[in-house]
Each structure stands twice: as C-alpha cells, then as structure tokens.
C-alpha cells in the first residue's frame, strides 16, 4: 500500500468533497473510462450524481471511500454497495473505482480495494462482486488482487465516446469471521 495515500470513508458530505469527487469522475470519463457517463460530462451532472450517492450513503446503503494524497488532494474513490436483496445479506458490490489519471500506478487503487475489503468484512459481507471493462486498468488491478473472473459480456456498455465495450464480471470470496 502507498503510505502517502490516506483512505477515509465519507462521513458527511462537504462542498469541497462534492467538487473534488466531481473532478475525479470527470477526469476519468474524459480519460475514456466507461463508468456510466458519456462525454461531455458537466460539473452539474457530476455533482448531482455525488449528491445522490452521498444521500444513499447517509441511508446506510453504501460506503464511499476517498483516497487523498500527502497534500490532502482527493485522487480516488470507490464505493461498497451494501443495499442488496434480503436473500443475499452476505454479499456486497464494489462500484465506481475511480482514480485520477495523475495518481494512477501509485498504489491508490490497491489501497482503495484493501479498504473496501476490510469494510466488507466488518459488515459481515463475505462475497464481493463487481464488473469492469474487459482489459482496462481495473481489470488488471482486480486480477492482481485475487479476484476471480466469472466471464465476459460483449457489448455491455458504451465508452464515453459512444462505442460499445465489453465488461468482465469478477467476484472475491472473503474469509468468514
């Protein structure tokens, strides 16, 4: 783990958090990440998304993690979605792993992933699932950290420029307490 990165969970939404989260999201989309948004992504749309996610976190439906560099600048985020059907209380979903392009390949994604896994165990969730663009940076990150591939779905989503892309579904079984 990168010692110059601090991971914290979003406890209370501050105006600066919304702006910083929006900047990371926009940077990722402008860099070509297929993360549910199309180009161009406005600040207003990005901020509205983060307000919805913060409200969901306040209801206990998800935990939003923030990664800050040594200067206190937000450089990444990920979500642990706990709101699952009642017959799946052992499961959670990992969503929106976003790392600003200037902070990639510095251990930020790995630190966020580690925080998500610890929080999942604390919430008694032993099965994590996610999907990511086949072959992208996230795909390699999850593969390196023990996640198992279930399969690929061709033409699942769109790149921000409108082209189709495939997704790969991953899971990770965590040790039960």
Regions found by a protein language model. Give the residues of each.
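Terminal substrate-recognition subdomain of acyl/acetyltransferases
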Residues: 2-3, 10-13, 148, 159-177
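Active-site-proximal loop/turn and secondary-structure-junction residues that shape catalytic pockets
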Residues: 98, 134-136
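Conserved catalytic-core motifs of GNAT/GCN5-like acyltransferases
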Residues: 127-132, 143, 148-164
């Amino acid at each position: 783990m990168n010692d110059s990165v601090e991971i914290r969970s979003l406890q209370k939404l501050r105006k600066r958090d919304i702006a910083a989260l929006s900047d990371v999201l926009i940077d990722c989309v402008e860099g070509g990440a297929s993360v549910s948004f199309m180009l161009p992504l406005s600040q207003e749309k990005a901020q509205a998304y983060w307000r919805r996610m913060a409200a969901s976190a306040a209801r206990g439906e998800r935990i939003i993690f923030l990664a800050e560099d040594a200067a206190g600048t937000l450089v990444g985020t990920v979500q642990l979605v706990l709101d699952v059907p009642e017959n799946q209380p052992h499961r959670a979903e990992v969503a929106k792993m976003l790392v600003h392009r200037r902070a990639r390949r510095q251990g930020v994604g790995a630190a966020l992933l580690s925080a998500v896994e610890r929080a999942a165990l604390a919430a008694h969730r032993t099965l994590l699932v996610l999907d990511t663009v086949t072959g992208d940076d996230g795909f390699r990150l999850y593969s390196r950290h023990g996640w198992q591939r279930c399969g690929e779905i061709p033409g699942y989503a769109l790149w921000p420029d409108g082209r189709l892309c495939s997704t790969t579904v991953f899971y990770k079984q965590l040790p039960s307490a």
